[in-house]
From Swiss-Prot:
Family label: Belongs to the GcvH family.
Segments forming domain Lipoyl-binding: 24-106
Protein name according to UniProt: Glycine cleavage system H protein
Record key words, sorted: Lipoyl
Residues with N6-lipoyllysine modification: K65
Gene name of the record: gcvH
Cofactor: (R)-lipoate
One GO term describing the cellular component: glycine cleavage complex
Amino acid sequence: MSTIPENLKYADSHEWVLDNGDGTVTVGITDHAQDLLGDVVYVELPEVGTEVTATEQFSLVESVKAASDIYAPVNGEVIEVNDALNDAPELINEAPFEGAWIAKIKLSNAADLDKLLDAAGYSATIA
């Protein structure tokens, strides 16, 4: 069974969002998503400074099974990426909620967070 931390918000496209409390969020993919993908071998990170639009592709994760687009869960600007994934994409499998975040985004509108699912809502989508 997939781990679904209560302190995060979720998109139904399997991204998690951590509200950093300063107008920024940290984004990654869920345990359920990495489990479906299998062993991750490559992560295409967005470029810092890129404007992202909620529900549009902003990253890519490749595994031994498939390549999967990663969708921005909020509108904003990429302010930081997790360069550790360039050398260790397997972190996505090993620690999807800890060391394997993909990007930090400066929110265009904090109300975007209200459109995301809580842990119970996300759990219902993958049940």
